[in-house]
């Protein structure tokens, strides 16, 4: 992947939901909810502040995160779907 996010943007590779429920039922694509979990694969330099400095990103590459269902923009590269989010759209870091 060759994408470098700007400023406080973060590129996340969504983690797909399970194909089979806990009870063993296969879940079709049409019934799956959009993923809201993913792994950070790239981060920008940080959020520009009013005084001209940058606030360093809190997340780092490799972090597993939870983000809002409708947050960010989708980007597809080499058949892989990514989300480009603002760091503020990330709700939590998992683990």
From Swiss-Prot:
PROSITE patterns: CHAPERONINS_CPN10. It comes from Xanthomonas campestris pv. campestris (strain ATCC 33913 / DSM 3586 / NCPPB 528 / LMG 568 / P 25). Belongs to the GroES chaperonin family. This is Co-chaperonin GroES. GO terms for molecular function: ATP binding; metal ion binding; protein folding chaperone; protein-folding chaperone binding; unfolded protein binding. The gene is groES. Pfam families: Cpn10. One of its GO terms (biological process) is chaperone cofactor-dependent protein refolding. GO terms for cellular component: cytoplasm. Heptamer of 7 subunits arranged in a ring. Interacts with the chaperonin GroEL. The keyword Chaperone applies. HAMAP family: CH10 (MF_00580). InterPro entries: Chaperonin_GroES, Chaperonin_GroES_sf, Chaprnonin_Cpn10_CS, GroES-like_sf. CDD domains: cpn10. Keywords: Chaperone, Cytoplasm. It is found in: Cytoplasm. Together with the chaperonin GroEL, plays an essential role in assisting protein folding. The GroEL-GroES system forms a nano-cage that allows encapsulation of the non-native substrate proteins and provides a physical environment optimized to promote and accelerate protein folding. GroES binds to the apical surface of the GroEL ring, thereby capping the opening of the GroEL channel.
């Amino acid at each position: 992947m060759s994408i470098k996010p700007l400023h406080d943007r973060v590129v996340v590779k969504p983690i797909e939901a399970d194909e089979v429920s806990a009870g063993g039922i296969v879940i079709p694509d049409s019934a799956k909810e959009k993923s809201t979990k993913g792994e950070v694969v790239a981060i920008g330099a940080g959020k520009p502040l009013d005084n001209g400095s940058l606030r360093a990103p809190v997340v780092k590459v490799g972090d597993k995160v939870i983000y809002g269902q409708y947050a960010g923009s989708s980007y597809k590269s080499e058949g892989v779907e990514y989300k480009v989010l603002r760091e503020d759209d990330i709700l939590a870091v998992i683990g």
